């Protein structure tokens, strides 16, 4: 298939710049992947669509305040976006500057928050293609602690506004636990504590994977034949208790429901790993990078239903949804969403999809 197959026209005013006041009050488009039927709902209705004994898979990553502003020692302005934390004092980052810093360039970051001349000193150690390896000059404080002081929430480029204090809470799921993401697993933003309690009381089971969403999730696909696209790698953890929960759910004939495309990619990576290693199980514990790319024609080994937001035209995420629900059903659903003025992208509305 071609990149242009996944294009749709999206009016700019349908891009959500701010979240709804109440998390679960967003709209939700229900799509039956088997016949293409559509139902217009509110997200809180999701409790009516999930049955006792079903298993919800959440991604418990926590978004870190990964964007920093500062200057090079020479005086030039610089913007740094953390992509991956390597250890307490080293990290990989994207850098925006009029001229890319050379090896051993000294940077001073966070002066916008700490005051002029008080920036945190960092050293550019090496370049790895599009990423820069940076190191804290002062090893007495860990990077994550420094980010809490000088970092900004890394809102996606299409939100097109500076981050605000409210984003520290709203661009974060209520069940976040493991710091490391530079973008939110946005399907999870719709769940509030009240809805989670309601689902638990109904007998719905929960399991938590960790996938640290990288900035690469916003990188455009640059090839016309989608099979030629090379996915960025992201770190995934699918522990034994998640594997056990999935196998127990399947054994009872209940459904495994992924909250977000990152949960899909985590679980399906663990299933692909099991298959490639000739495991007797449907999936195995998985602690590694994944660059799994799911597009029409690829099979789903585990996931039965998907909760997800509306994604960018020509993105790998709309390709994943098309693989799950069927290409034509997906594009018809998106057409209906535009016509009915659903809100799109990270702070937008949601879909509940059953597999084709």
UniProtKB/Swiss-Prot annotation:
Molecular function per GO: S-adenosylmethionine:tRNA ribosyltransferase-isomerase activity
Subunit structure, as described in the record: Monomer.
Entry's transmembrane regions: none
Classification via PANTHER family: S-ADENOSYLMETHIONINE:TRNA RIBOSYLTRANSFERASE-ISOMERASE (PTHR30307:SF0)
Record EC number: 2.4.99.17
Organism: Histophilus somni (strain 2336) (Haemophilus somnus)
Keyword Cytoplasm tagged: yes
Pfam families for the chain: Queuosine_synth (PF02547)
Gene name as annotated: queA
Family in the record: Belongs to the QueA family.
Lineage: Bacteria, Pseudomonadati, Pseudomonadota, Gammaproteobacteria, Pasteurellales
Role summary: Transfers and isomerizes the ribose moiety from AdoMet to the 7-aminomethyl group of 7-deazaguanine (preQ1-tRNA) to give epoxyqueuosine (oQ-tRNA).
Protein name from the UniProt record: S-adenosylmethionine:tRNA ribosyltransferase-isomerase
Record keywords, A-Z: Cytoplasm, Queuosine biosynthesis, S-adenosyl-L-methionine, Transferase
Catalytic activity: 7-aminomethyl-7-carbaguanosine(34) in tRNA + S-adenosyl-L-methionine = epoxyqueuosine(34) in tRNA + adenine + L-methionine + 2 H(+)
